[in-house]
Amino acid sequence: MYTILLIGIGGFIGAVLRYSLSGWVQNSFVNFPLGTLVVNIVGSFFLGLVMYLSEYQGLFSEETRILLTIGLLGAFTTLSTFSYESFRLLESSKLMQLTMNIVATVLFSIFAVYLGKISALNLAAYLRGIK
C-alpha cells in the first residue's frame, strides 16, 4: 500500500509538471507538438540520471526511486500523447513535421538518457571526492 501511495504522489506531481511545462512550451508552437517533445526529452534525461544514480551508485533508496521513476517521471513523460500528436500530423498530411516529430523524439530521448547517465556518473564521482 505504501508503494502505491508513493507512485500516486509522484504521479500527481509529474502530471502537474508535465501539464505546466508542455503548455508553457507549446504556447509558442501551434503547428508542431514541441511541448510533448520537450517533456519527453527532459523526462528521459532525468530517468537516466535517477536510474544510474540509484542502480549503479546506490544514491536513492528503492522507495525514492519508485516515487521518482514510476510515479513522477512515469506521469511526466507520455508515449500516448506523442502517438496521438504524430497521428494528427499524419492525418493532416504534414509528413515532414510527422517525420521530424518521430525522429526528434526517439533520437533526442535516447540521447537524453545517455546524458542522464553521464551526469549521474560525474555527480557520483564528485560526491565520492567530497567524502
Curated annotation (Swiss-Prot):
Na(+) binds at G74, T77. It is a multi-pass membrane protein. GO terms for biological process: cellular detoxification of fluoride; fluoride transmembrane transport. GO terms for cellular component: plasma membrane. Keywords: Cell membrane, Ion channel, Ion transport, Membrane, Metal-binding, Sodium, Transmembrane, Transmembrane helix, Transport. GO terms for molecular function: fluoride channel activity; fluoride transmembrane transporter activity; metal ion binding. Its main location: membrane. It catalyses: fluoride(in) = fluoride(out). The chain crosses the membrane at residues 4-24, 32-52, 66-86, 95-115. It is found in: Cell membrane. Na(+) is not transported, but it plays an essential structural role and its presence is essential for fluoride channel function. Belongs to the fluoride channel Fluc/FEX (TC 1.A.43) family. NCBIfam families: crcB (TIGR00494). HAMAP family: FluC. Fluoride-specific ion channel. Important for reducing fluoride concentration in the cell, thus reducing its toxicity. This is Fluoride-specific ion channel FluC 1. The gene is fluC1.
